[in-house]
Amino acid sequence: DNFSTRYLVNAASKKLSVPLISASAIGFQGQLLMVDADSACYECLFPKEQHDNEGLRCAESGVLATTPVMIASLQAHHTLLFLGLNLSPLKSKLLLWDGLTLKQRILHFEKDTNCPICQASLSVN
């Protein structure tokens, strides 16, 4: 529910080359993505300068109690795949889950060549 923290954790993940499996939920919808040293990052997908930090928040918009449970389950499953089998099916992909239709979509996204986080991690690594 805190976009500033999402951007800070993303930057730390890239700088330290520590994988990040990020999840979020609002209303009936959820998102899940994975960031690692070689992949596109959270800021590539959601550029900070284009993001309205006063956007949707669960406190104002609400969230169905089961939505975070579903997204957390997907996040835990993906984490176990990564840690146990070294699989990362969501690397540079965004999983969108819709709790009204019970459908999910997976969108591929590329590194943004102008992303300040990815550029900074190149100079560190």
Language-model segment annotations:
Residues 1-125:
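Glycine-rich phosphate/adenylate-binding loop
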